C-alpha cells in the first residue's frame, strides 16, 4: 500500500471493469474466428483467449472466507505462466484479481444482517448503482443496541447527469447537449443538487444511524485520510461541506434521512473528462422565460480533478482506512457486486423507476414559468400544465410544450 501511494503520480490511468469485459469479448471473437479459419492455430488461439479469461479455479468464494485470490497449483506450466500474466495485468491496472461477485441471495443475506462492511460495485450502470445504493440503505437493519451498522458503498458510473429528487430539471440541465454527448439523465432518490459523472469520478456512500449522522463527518474523515498519506493534496472542507482543493470543488454531496437511518453520498473527481462536462448544466432556454420554483437550485462552483489519484487507488485507500477506523468486532469485509449476478426484484423495481420517464420528467416540485413577451404564465405540477392564461395549453405535458414552444406561442 505505501509503495502504491508514494507513486500516485506515476500510476496508470484507471481502466474500468467494463473495459476489461470489452477486451475479453474482443479476444473471444477473434479467437473463435481464427479457430474456424484454421484448426492448426488452435493451441496458440486458446492461449490468448485464456490470457484474458479469469479461470474459475482462481476465484475465491468470498473475501471474508479466507481463500486465496490466486491459486498456483496448476499442472501445466503454460497455464501457470498465463495465470501469472493475468494477475500481473490486473494488478498493474489496479483492478484487483478475480474478485468474487456476490449472488442475489448473498447480497440479501449480507445487507439484512447486522454488521459493518464495504461494498464495491463493479458495474458502471448508473441505474443499477443508484438502485443498489437504495437497496442497501432501505434494508440495513437498525441496531437496537451496541454499535450501529455503518456501511460504505463505492460505485463508478458511466456518463450521466444526476439531478436531485426535488429539482426542476428544466432549470438544471441542457437535455439536447446531454443527448448529443451520450449522457444519461437520472433523478436520484435523495435531495441535493445536480452532478455529472463519468468513469473518472468515484461515488461513495456512507450509511449510518440517524442518531450518529452528521453531514460533514465523513468528508472530514476522507480529507484527514488522504492528506495524511499525501500532504501535497491540500484538501479542505468549505462551509457547505464540499471537499475543495486550491479553491476548486472536487466533491459534491447529498443526503437522505429515513427510517432511523441516514446516508451521505458524494462524488470525487479524480480523472474525469471535464471538457465533456462543459455546457451540460447550462440550460439553453429562451431568454424571455422567467421561472418560479420551490425546488432545490444547484450552486454553481468551479471544479477540477484531484489528478494524482486514480479511482481504484481512492477506493483502496478509503476502504482500508474505513476498515481500521470503524472496526469493532472482527475485520470489516469488502464485497463486490454487479448488475448481472447481484440483482433481485427490489433492485430491478428501483432501476425501472429510475429509467422511467414518469420519474424523470413527471415528478419533482411545482413550478411556474412566465413567457414575458407573450404575456403568458404557465403553472406545472408533476410535469403537466394545470393552469395557464390559455385554456388550450391546460393538460399538456410541459416536456412536449417546451420541445415545440414555437408552435404554441
Curated annotation (Swiss-Prot):
(R)-lipoate binds at residue 249. The keyword Ligase applies. Keywords: ATP-binding, Ligase, Nucleotide-binding. Residues 146-330 form the BPL/LPL catalytic domain. Pathway: Protein modification; protein lipoylation via exogenous pathway; protein N(6)-(lipoyl)lysine from lipoate: step 1/2; Protein modification; protein lipoylation via exogenous pathway; protein N(6)-(lipoyl)lysine from lipoate: step 2/2. InterPro entries: aa-tRNA-synth_II/BPL/LPL, BPL_LPL_catalytic, LipoylTrfase_LipoateP_Ligase. Coiled coil: none annotated. Its EC number is 6.3.1.20. ATP binds at residues 188, 193-196, 249. One of its GO terms (biological process) is protein modification process. It catalyses: L-lysyl-[lipoyl-carrier protein] + (R)-lipoate + ATP = N(6)-[(R)-lipoyl]-L-lysyl-[lipoyl-carrier protein] + AMP + diphosphate + H(+). One of its GO terms (molecular function) is lipoyltransferase activity. The keyword Ligase applies. One of its GO terms (cellular component) is mitochondrion. It comes from the Eukaryota. It holds the Pfam family LplA-B_cat. Monomer. Catalyzes both the ATP-dependent activation of exogenously supplied lipoate to lipoyl-AMP and the transfer of the activated lipoyl onto the lipoyl domains of lipoate-dependent enzymes. Belongs to the LplA family. NCBIfam families: lipoyltrans. In the transfer reaction, the free carboxyl group of lipoic acid is attached via an amide linkage to the epsilon-amino group of a specific lysine residue of lipoyl domains of lipoate-dependent enzymes. This is Putative lipoate-protein ligase A. It comes from Saccharomyces cerevisiae (strain YJM789).
